[in-house]
């Protein structure tokens, strides 16, 4: 497998208020926020410079992410940018690993995503991100 570029770090926040406090505490600003239907969450990405990695604050409105870490939120995933999410899925599955979704789902900001299950990522939930062509 070739080297993958870090795309973002995902943190689940159990409320918009907590997300706002986190942003203020660390001098972060919103780049964009979008509702992601497949995860029933508002996903906020921070502004960042060219050589920096953004943070994604996932604010679940309902569903499984609302109960993440007993409803407290916290560190959730790291995301790598890939050319082709479906090709990555095929490669990992050929090695006996499983991803969360049957096929990639839309994410915030013009991307599609899928996640490697934590038991195959050494305990870490790993997201694969493919930017859609404009």
Region locations from a protein language model:
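Extracellular structured ligand-interaction cores
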Residues: 6, 75, 125
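Vicinal oxygen chelate
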Residues: 1-2, 13-20, 25, 35, 44-49, 55, 70-119, ...
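Long, hydrophobic N-terminal alpha-helical segment
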Residues: 1-39
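Short, flexible, solvent-exposed loop/turn segments with mixed acidic/basic and small polar residues
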Residues: 1, 65-70
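Short secondary-structure capping micro-motifs at structural edges
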Residues: 33, 42-43, 64-66
